[in-house]
């Protein structure tokens, strides 16, 4: 299917949506147009995900996943546009966190600044062997503003997060894996297909159950055990009485794969 956006390339693969950040000539950096379009795309998913059960986010080309904010655009921005950009980035990170559909990243190259923060904000990520990561904000005279001080400690631990953010150093895909920022490092030639394969597995599961499990998991790092467990039980209840649950029971008895419909 053709994409309605200028800075995003969107394709469908069954119940999986593949989204490419599509500004390769500018390092897939996030300008105002891309920030607007990412927010619009996520809002549409929040309102009605339709047949989409899992998302894979990657960068166009084979060198850069996302180079962060568009510094060339920023240099000529009026104050009102700067404020608009900040508001859009805040909304973007919140919408990623609140998205009802799991989002996976296929990090196909450098993920710098906001690009690295997007990787930290989504559900989980695979990276190519050539991927690199950096949070260079302190080297550019600012502190992080797209969630890094909150998402990186949750993924990597507070001491590692301080090292990454306060030095602004570049680190490798293997280090990102060892520190918890990405789940797996794979050859560049197989990255997209391996990530899509995981997305297809998620998409084949009961959609309501996946959504409810994701909601419960998303509060696990913030809530105490008792609060989190109560939330899990509340999330579990509608799945236990769903038609998909009955379909799974029937399919098991009939020795076949279940066909889930999301209800």
Region spans (language model):
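Phosphate-coordinating loops and pocket residues in cytosolic domains that bind phosphorylated ligands
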Residues: 29-32, 67, 76, 166, ...
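Short, conserved glycine- and acidic-residue-centered signature motifs
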Residues: 31-34, 85, 112, 145
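Conserved CoA-thioester-binding segment of acyl-CoA-metabolizing enzymes
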Residues: 1-58, 94
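Hydrophobic alpha-helical membrane-association signature
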Residues: 34-38, 85-88, 118, 191, ...
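Crotonase-fold acyl-CoA enzyme core
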Residues: 94-210, 237-242, 247-250, 254-256
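Structured loop/turn residues at beta-strand edges in well-structured enzyme cores
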Residues: 3, 14, 50-52, 69, ...
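Glycine- (often His-adjacent) and acidic-residue-rich active-site loop
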Residues: 51, 59-95, 111, 141, ...
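C-terminal alpha-helix plus adjacent terminal tail
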Residues: 1-17, 45-50, 62, 168-174, ...
């Amino acid at each position: 299917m053709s994409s309605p956006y200028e800075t995003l390339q969107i394709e469908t693969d069954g119940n999986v949506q593949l989204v490419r950040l599509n500004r390769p000539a500018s390092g897939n950096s996030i300008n105002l147009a891309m920030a607007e379009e990412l927010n619009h795309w996520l809002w549409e998913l929040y309102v009605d995900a339709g047949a989409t059960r899992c998302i894979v986010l990657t960068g166009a080309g084979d060198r850069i996943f996302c180079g962060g904010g568009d510094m060339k655009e920023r240099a000529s921005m009026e104050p009102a546009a700067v404020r608009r950009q900040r508001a859009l980035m805040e909304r973007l990170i919140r919408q990623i966190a609140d998205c009802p559909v799991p989002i996976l990243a296929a990090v196909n190259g450098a993920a710098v600044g906001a690009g690295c923060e997007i990787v930290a904000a989504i559900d989980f990520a695979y990276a190519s062997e050539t991927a690199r990561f950096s949070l260079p904000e302190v080297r550019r005279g600012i502190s992080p503003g797209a969630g890094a001080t909150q998402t990186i400690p949750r993924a990597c631990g507070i001491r590692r997060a301080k090292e990454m953010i306060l030095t602004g150093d570049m680190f490798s895909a293997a280090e990102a894996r060892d520190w918890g920022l990405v789940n797996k490092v794979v050859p560049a030639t197989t990255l997209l297909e391996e990530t899509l394969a995981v997305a297809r597995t998620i998409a084949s599961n009961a959609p309501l159950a996946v959504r409810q499990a994701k909601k419960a998991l998303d509060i696990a790092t913030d809530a105490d055990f008792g609060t989190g467990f109560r939330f899990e039980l509340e999330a579990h209840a509608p799945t236990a009485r769903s038609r998909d649950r009955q379909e799974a029971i029937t399919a098991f008895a009939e020795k076949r794969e279940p066909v889930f419909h999301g209800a």
